[in-house]
């Protein structure tokens, strides 16, 4: 689809020329990789290759097709691979991006030394070293595919036209799998000047499946009665499994490990059978037309059911209901009818069931034969078609007596192309972990089904024009067609799916595939008690009521967000145009998710909020609340000295309570909350803070303060040991961080505890960022010696920094105050994907403080840690207050938890 190829990045956009000047290259040596039969498969080194080490899925969706990021990629690389089938061309291409953080920054070097980081730099948001994009074309429109490749210069060794004045043709080799590798070889040579090297289809299929199942967290899903449920696969427990590829025929492959697989069975009754017989019997001209017919069918008009044999009764003695199919097409035997007397819709449905049920049964029997626990289905016949998946799922469920489930893959259409891509030497995908992949969905994802229409869009102006074109034409979001509930749904030898027809979709666009960004600097937060069972989202958006509520909240907040974003850039005509385009794009995302919650993978509130921020950045609103944050920071810094003086006059016990009250009171400042936005219109930031603090009365709705106080101050004359290092996850700018979290950090520093302030890598609403914190700390340090000395020790004050290795200047009584980025740009945080710097800082930490609704309530409220945890937040949403803590809006949470053993 036009406009889906690239996404805006605020750091990278102005750095393209520097990117093209990278001089790193990788020598391509030739290798031999063993095939399953023992015959070596030659892996060509004739074309430059990708270094996909530490790749990550982040970013842009090509509608249904994702992109992957390769951080360690050199310039001399392969840029694409294809799977050319009889009906579709699947193209996977690489786009290069680099991280441009300044490793010579003195402040960052100092913090890096303190954290013991020896490699890499301190920029912790995903390093956009590269992305893998997934695109598809219809095979009979191959010239459109070639035009796309040519327009993006993917066939050249250096695809970046700004890096040199003249670009030689890429006379190397492109890896291709599928039958079209032979058919179109001459056309590729003629049009693009490149040669095609064909890769074994089955090897590519297995390689692609292995990568997806290990590297993408929510890749596999089940599909029963129209409901999708994503399945978490443990990469260490993946093998062996059964891969069933349903194309024209069916191949059943037993996969035992990387490069270890065997075709153990198959059948000639597959997608080609359905299409061929269906075309003869119904006169349909296309596979999709035949599938559409099945939506309206009633197979009881053609299939012989158990009830037809036993007078409408069940055969209960052997467990068969009256609606069970006894014989596919069996009713046609006894009826004196010609072909024209039967409805094409009924024929299509009966044929679809007959073939799908048999594929499901044969697959299960092979899994049983080899003692396999998992069956994954893919191929042209599946194509994300909901009714086909439901039918196969019921077959596997029935024959296994509920002990096994059929599973499907979100990216299953690209297994071959991905495998061909991985056949290049030094492709680097082998070491990729799921926490290093981020999938993002660009503006066009809700509008089309993944096809490319015309040339790729070159810049933001073209993207906006594309959006405006849809509005002018009144184009609706492309939506899967709801199925009519079937009158009878008999299964061959087993029960029928219940008639949840309205939940079933007729086309493959029910699931979108995004752009996979490879981010090497993301890691799993090492202090999680059990990363395998960790679920960041507190609210279950699989619940329809919850999902509809939060989608509505985001929709209602959209006008205010657009106004703020446009105002942040001076209200220019350009800003207004981009604001309108953002509103349309994000509204389309919300509508898509309202219709199909699983369209972008497993849906959680954290994903929704991050999607909004990514959409803002796509339309170049880098920091919509910049001016608001600056104003609130200045106002808060002005009253900070009085607050610190007040705190210093208190006893230790009173001060600790006041500090926690201050954090909770200051957390009221949240531009993501409708209730709080209303408050902003009625008073100044200081007035609101004082009002909030005056209303602080214990007990709070969740009140573990006494336990926390005992841990901090001890009891019965017993002095507790001090914390070694505290990680403080901060939330909003202004009063929240300056009057709330900084005084709390100061208290820990006073006690000799190292403090690491953890903040967003990229802006999100009015959340403070790690880039902004040093200036805020510097402003606060002017009024406080404790903060000044700690900031100097932590490398935050550039003009007065202490060299950590300089013993003569080092104040042994001062604990350092440091700042690290968390690796994300969202109001929430998924601790399965944090920056490498945060992971390094966590290794010596024995206290985690999560502050704010996004990080402590929407996500991580139920998270358990290997160390102590303190979760502090004011609830600024009535529904969340009722659901989560059985309270009311503006109730407070102070949750202290000892280490989870």
Curated annotation (Swiss-Prot):
Region (Disordered): 1-50
Known catalytic reactions: (R)-pantothenate + ATP = (R)-4'-phosphopantothenate + ADP + H(+); (R)-4'-phosphopantothenate + H2O = (R)-pantothenate + phosphate; (R)-4'-phosphopantetheine + H2O = (R)-pantetheine + phosphate; (R)-4'-phosphopantetheine sulfonate + H2O = (R)-pantetheine sulfonate + phosphate
GO molecular function terms attached to this record: ATP binding; hydrolase activity; metal ion binding; pantothenate kinase activity
Ranges where the record places region Pantothenate kinase: 1-466
Tissue-specific expression: Highly expressed in leaves and developing seeds. Expressed in roots, stems and flowers.
Domain of life the protein comes from: Eukaryota
Pathway: Cofactor biosynthesis; coenzyme A biosynthesis; CoA from (R)-pantothenate: step 1/5
Regulation of its function: Activity is strongly promoted by Co(2+), Ni(2+) and Mn(2+). Activity is inhibited by EDTA.
Details of cofactor binding: Phosphatase activity is strongly promoted by several divalent cation ions but it is suggested s that Mn(2+) and possibly Ni(2+) represent biologically relevant metal ion cofactors for damage-control phosphatases.
Amino acid composition bias (Acidic residues), ranges on this chain: 1-10
Record EC number: 2.7.1.33, 3.1.3.-
Chain spans, region 4'-phosphopantetheine phosphatase: 467-901
Knockout-associated phenotype: No visible phenotype under normal growth conditions, but homozygous double mutants pank1-1 and pank2-1 are embryonic lethal.
Ranges spanned by the short sequence motif Subfamily II EGMGR motif, renumbered to the chain: 851-855
SUPFAM superfamilies: Actin-like ATPase domain, AF1104-like
A Gene Ontology BP annotation from the UniProt entry: coenzyme A biosynthetic process
Listed InterPro entries: ARMT-1-like_metal-bd_sf (IPR036075), ARMT1-like_metal-bd (IPR002791), At2g17340_3_helix_bundle (IPR035073), ATPase_NBD (IPR043129), PanK_long (IPR015844), Type_II_PanK (IPR004567)
Keywords: ATP-binding, Coenzyme A biosynthesis, Hydrolase, Kinase, Manganese, Metal-binding, Nickel, Nucleotide-binding, Transferase
Annotated binding of Mn(2+), by residue: 731-732, 767
Protein family according to the UniProt entry: In the N-terminal section; belongs to the type II pantothenate kinase family. In the C-terminal section; belongs to the damage-control phosphatase family. Phosphopantetheine phosphatase II subfamily.
PANTHER family: PANTOTHENATE KINASE, PANTOTHENATE KINASE 1
Function, as annotated: Catalyzes the phosphorylation of pantothenate the first step in CoA biosynthesis. May play a role in the physiological regulation of the intracellular CoA concentration. Functionally redudant with PANK1. The phosphatase activity shows preference for normal or oxidatively damaged intermediates of 4'-phosphopantetheine, which provides strong indirect evidence that the phosphatase activity pre-empts damage in the CoA pathway. Hydrolyzing excess 4'-phosphopantetheine could constitute a directed overflow mechanism to prevent its oxidation to the S-sulfonate, sulfonate, or other forms.
Domain comment (free text): Subfamily II proteins have an EGMGR motif about 50 residues from the C-terminus. This motif lies near the metal-binding residues in the putative substrate-binding cleft 2. Subfamily II proteins occur only in eukaryotes, in two forms: as a stand-alone unit in plants, and as a C-terminal domain of pantothenate kinases in plants, animals, and chytrid fungi.
Name by which UniProt lists this protein: Pantothenate kinase 2
Organism of this sequence: Arabidopsis thaliana
């Amino acid at each position: 689809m036009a406009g889906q190829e690239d996404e805006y990045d605020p750091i990278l956009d102005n750095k393209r020329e520097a990117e093209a000047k990278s001089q790193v290259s990788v020598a391509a040596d030739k290798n031999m990789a063993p095939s399953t039969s023992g015959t070596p498969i030659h892996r060509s080194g004739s074309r430059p290759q990708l270094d996909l080490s530490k790749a990550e899925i982040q970013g842009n969706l090509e509608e249904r097709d994702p992109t992957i990021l390769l951080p360690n990629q050199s310039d001399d690389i392969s840029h694409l691979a294809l799977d050319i089938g009889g009906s579709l061309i699947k193209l996977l291409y690489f786009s290069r991006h680099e991280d441009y953080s300044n490793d010579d920054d003195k402040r960052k070097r100092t913090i890096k030394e303190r954290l013991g980081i020896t490699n890499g730099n301190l920029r912790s948001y995903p390093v956009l070293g590269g992305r893998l994009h997934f695109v598809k074309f219809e095979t009979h429109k191959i010239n459109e595919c070639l035009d796309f490749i040519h327009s993006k210069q993917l066939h050249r060794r250096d695809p970046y036209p700004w890096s040199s004045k003249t670009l030689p043709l890429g006379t190397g080799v492109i890896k291709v799998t599928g039958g079209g590798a032979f058919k179109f070889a001459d056309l590729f040579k003629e049009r693009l000047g490149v040669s095609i090297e064909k890769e074994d289809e089955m090897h590519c299929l297995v390689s692609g499946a292995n990568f997806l199942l290990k590297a993408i967290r929510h890749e596999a899903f089940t599909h029963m009665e129209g409901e999708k449920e994503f399945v978490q696969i443990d990469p260490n427990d993946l093998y062996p499994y059964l891969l069933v590829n349903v194309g024209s025929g069916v191949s059943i492959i037993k996969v035992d490990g990387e490069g270890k697989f065997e075709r153990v069975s198959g059948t000639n009754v597959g997608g080609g059978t359905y299409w061929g017989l269906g075309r003869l019997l119904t006169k349909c001209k296309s596979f999709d037309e035949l599938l559409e017919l099945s939506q309206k069918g009633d197979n009881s008009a053609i299939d012989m059911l158990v009830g037809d044999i036993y007078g409408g009764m069940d055969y209960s003695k052997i467990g068969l209901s009256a609606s069970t199919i006894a014989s596919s097409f069996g009713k046609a035997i006894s009826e004196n009818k010609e072909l024209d007397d039967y409805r094409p819709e009924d024929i299509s449905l009966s044929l679809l069931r007959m073939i799908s049920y048999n594929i499901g049964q044969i697959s299960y029997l092979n899994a049983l034969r080899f003692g396999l626990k998992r069956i994954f289905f893919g191929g042209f016949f599946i194509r994300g078609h909901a009714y086909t998946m439901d039918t196969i799922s019921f077959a596997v469920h029935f024959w296994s007596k509920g002990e096994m489930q059929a599973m499907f893959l979100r990216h299953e259409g690209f297994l071959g192309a991905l495998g061909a891509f991985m056949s290049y030497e030094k492709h680097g995908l082998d070491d990729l972990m799921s926490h290093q992949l981020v999938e993002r969905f660009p503006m066009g994802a809700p509008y089309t089904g993944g096809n490319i229409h015309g040339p790729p869009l070159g810049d933001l102006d073209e993207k906006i024009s594309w959006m405006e074109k849809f509005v002018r034409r009144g184009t609706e979001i492309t939506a899967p067609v709801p199925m009519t509930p079937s009158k009878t749904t008999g299964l061959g030898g087993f029960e029928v799916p219940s008639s949840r027809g309205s939940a079933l979709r007729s086309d493959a666009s029910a699931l979108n595939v995004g752009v996979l960004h490879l981010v090497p600097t993301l890691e799993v937060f090492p202090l999680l008690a059990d990363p395998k069972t960790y679920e960041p989202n507190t609210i279950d958006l699989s619940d329809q009521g919850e999902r509809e509520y939060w989608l509505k909240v985001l929709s209602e907040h959209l006008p205010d967000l657009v106004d703020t974003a446009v105002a942040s850039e001076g209200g220019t005509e350009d800003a207004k145009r981009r604001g309108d385009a953002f509103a349309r794009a994000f509204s389309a995302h919300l509508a898509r998710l309202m219709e199909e919650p699983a369209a972008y993978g497993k849906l959680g509130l954290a994903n929704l909020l991050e999607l909004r921020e990514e959409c803002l950045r796509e339309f170049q609103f880098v920091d919509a609340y910049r001016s608001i944050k600056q104003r609130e920071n200045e106002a808060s810094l002005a009253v900070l000295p009085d607050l610190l003086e007040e705190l210093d006059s208190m006893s230790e016990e009173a001060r600790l309570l006041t500090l926690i009250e201050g954090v909770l009171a200051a957390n009221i400042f949240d531009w993501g909350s409708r209730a709080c936005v209303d408050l902003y219109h009625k008073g100044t930031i200081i007035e609101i803070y004082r009002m909030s603090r005056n209303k602080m009365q214990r007990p709070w709705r969740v009140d573990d303060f006494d336990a926390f106080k005992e841990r901090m101050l001890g009891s019965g004359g017993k002095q507790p040991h001090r914390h070694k290092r505290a990680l403080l996850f901060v939330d909003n700018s202004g009063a929240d961080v300056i009057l709330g979290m900084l005084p709390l950090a100061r208290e820990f520093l006073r006690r000799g505890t190292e403090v690491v302030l953890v903040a967003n890598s990229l802006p999100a609403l009015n959340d403070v960022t790690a880039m902004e914190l040093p200036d805020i700390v510097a402003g606060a340090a002017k009024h406080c010696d404790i903060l000044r000395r700690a900031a100097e020790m932590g490398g935050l004050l550039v003009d007065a920094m202490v060299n950590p290795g300089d013993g003569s200047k080092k104040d042994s009584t001062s604990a350092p105050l440091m700042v690290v980025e968390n690796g994300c740009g969202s109001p929430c945080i998924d601790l399965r994907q944090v920056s490498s710097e945060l992971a390094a800082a966590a290794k010596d930490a024995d206290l985690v403080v999560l502050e704010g609704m996004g990080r402590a309530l929407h996500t991580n409220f139920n998270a358990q840690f290997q160390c102590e945890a303190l979760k502090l937040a004011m609830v600024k949403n009535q529904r969340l207050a009722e659901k989560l803590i059985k309270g009311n809006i503006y109730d407070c949470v102070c949750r202290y938890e000892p280490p989870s053993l």
